[in-house]
Amino acid sequence: MNLDFSERYAARPLTESDADAILTLCAENEQFYRYHPPLATKESVLEDLSALPPGKSAADKHYLGFFDGETLVAVLDLILDYPQEGTAYLGFFMTQKAVQGRGIGSALIGELLNELRKADCKKARLAVDRGNPQSKAFWEKNGFALTGEEFLHGDSAYLPMERAL
């Protein structure tokens, strides 16, 4: 799969040396963490870089950054063939606050979905935090729909969403 699929931004795998830039991007997005506590820390960012669901290997994970020059504009955590073969799981997607509301996040997701389709993925899946209307609206705008499932997580729950490719 071609990971540098964005026409507008340079995409590359993120590493530990990018942790401060990732943390800065996350810290700008206080609203997300209102529904998904706790706030990101450098330690949690470093953990996320390599976190894998059961049964998956590092070869299945792509933790990508999208850059405008040296500026990190968006972060995407993608797991291929999870939770089943042919499904791409978007574990995390966040854009820099300064670019929100301008269609940039939707454009990146559109480019990602086109690339996943070319790679023979059949569907994309993700989960939003229950009670987060902004996240739910963003993903619905991008063609995702709630599956009807709910997975409890602390005092809240994750609501899976899917989109056929």
Question: Residue spans of the language-model regions?
Answer:
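Terminal substrate-recognition subdomain of acyl/acetyltransferases
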Residues: 1-2, 155-165
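Residues forming the Rossmann-fold NAD(P)(H) cofactor-binding site
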Residues: 106
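Acetyl-CoA-dependent GNAT
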Residues: 4-9, 13-19, 24-98, 109-111, ...
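Conserved GNAT acetyl-CoA-binding A-motif
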Residues: 117-127
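Conserved beta-strand-loop-alpha-helix junction that forms the acyl-donor binding cleft
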Residues: 126-136, 152-156
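Conserved acetyl-CoA-binding loop of GNAT-fold acetyltransferases
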Residues: 140-149
